[in-house]
Structure formats: C-alpha cells, structure tokens
C-alpha cells in the first residue's frame, strides 16, 4: 500500500498543440512545491473510471484530477460505486485543465494560477459536498443512475455545449467558441415540448432550455451551492428573437436570472415526465437520452472535496 500522503494524480489532456506544454508547467510546479505523487494519464472517458478505481484499490487517500468538469464527473461516479466507508477515506481534488472548468471556478481555482491551486490542495482542507443524481431507464430497459457535480442541461444549452466541444479547436477562445455555437444553434430547433414537475408546480409547455444545478450551471443557476441539500433550477421559455440576444448578453454578464423568460426554482427533486427530442447534457457532456420519464434528486454530503484555504 502507498504512503497515505501521496497523491494519485490523473492527468486528462485537454487536446490541442499546447497540451504537452501545459502538463510540463503543472509538473514543474508540483516538483517545486515538493508534492509526492504518482501519475497516470487517461486515454478516454472510460479509462478515467478505470484509473480512479486503480488508485482506490492501491490505497491512495488523495486523488487529484488534472482535468475539467467531465473528468470530475467520471471520478465521482466511480467513487459512488464503492463502499461508503471506503469512499469516506478518500479526498478528491482538481487542477483545472478542461474545456469547461465551472466546478473548479466555483471554488476559486484558476486555470492560470497553478502555483496557488497546488498550494491550496497541499493544505488538504476538506469539505463534504452534495451530488445531484439522475435516475432513468435506458434504451435496453435497464434502470440507470448517473451522478453530477455541477448541472444537468436539457434542451438548447445541452446542444450548444455539444457543438462547443466540436468547435473549440477551431476558435481557440472559449467565449468565442460558445458565442459562435450559440449563433449557429439559432438556425436550428429552439424549443421543446416538456412536461416537468418542480415542487407543487407543473410545467407543461414549450421550453427552450432547462438547467438543474447542484453548482452554478455555467451561469444558469448562479446562486446554487453544492452543500445545502438543494437543487437550483432555471426554466427558459421560448423568447422572441430580440429577447434571445438580450438573454445572451445577460448570460455573458452573469445576470441570467434577470431575463424575463427565465423562471427560477429551488427544490430537492425534479421529475421530467416528457422532454420530447431534447438533448441532455451532464456536467458539460452529452449523455444517452433516457427513455420515458426520469427523476433528478440531490444526495447530501457524499464526497470529500479539497477546497482552497
């Protein structure tokens, strides 16, 4: 078994020509700060869960993901498959290195300040955090569940994020990639027939997009925190074209909830009875569309997460 103070570090390459330089900089900071770690590199989504399980089986108590929201999602889903007592001995940390790093940014971890991030992780300050959980039936008729740290998107934003993943290598800039994806999506389907239950409210109308956030949801659930046992929900009805561009402006400015087409909620459970033809994204990555109704809930204080001092 390994030294309990040694990190199990999982590097998830972001892609692009600067990927190696990014890792060299991170490696240099780790050495400068005297971090004792073992390093593995992921090849794809499936390898993340396999490598996390390898770290756990070999007794690592601190697992640090050098990656983004999707890699963190894979990590927590692996942790949720092990015995709760064993999971309680493991702390999860992150050095932001993904296309989308919203959950890391919530805690104040910066993509650019690697020195500060590593110094904070070394302090091993732990906070127990909540996870969201979607329960659904897949195309094979199997009952499934998937956990999330940040959010689930249903509708337009899920489609935009999928397009953004495909275009970020072209545009380089994350903001430019997102805005271009948004504009491209205007020429496609903008709303979806939905039937949703939130608390005592029943929503049965055409909806452009819905975000269920355990975290800030890429700006759509800006008041959500992953430690209050609640989910924040924003439901966006189909705005007029002028309102749509106003919505883009407010989204970029961080004032998304101020838009007249946005309807915010706070709840412990969301029941989606119908979301016809809408894509579903979980922590920034498309998931296989559930067959029939599905439920989204929150599970309190199940992951030990390393936060800044």
What positions do the PLM features span?
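Short amphipathic alpha-helical segments
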Residues: 21-23, 76-79, 105-107, 223-224
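Short glycine/serine/threonine-rich phosphate/pyrophosphate-binding segments
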Residues: 48, 71-75, 129
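Short N-terminal binding/cap micro-motifs at the start of the first secondary-structure element
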Residues: 16-20, 159, 219
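Glycine-rich phosphate/pyrophosphate-binding beta-alpha loops
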Residues: 153, 157, 211-222
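Short beta->alpha linker loops
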Residues: 43-47, 67-70, 98, 155
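Catalytic core of DAGKc-family lipid kinases
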Residues: 10, 33, 81-208
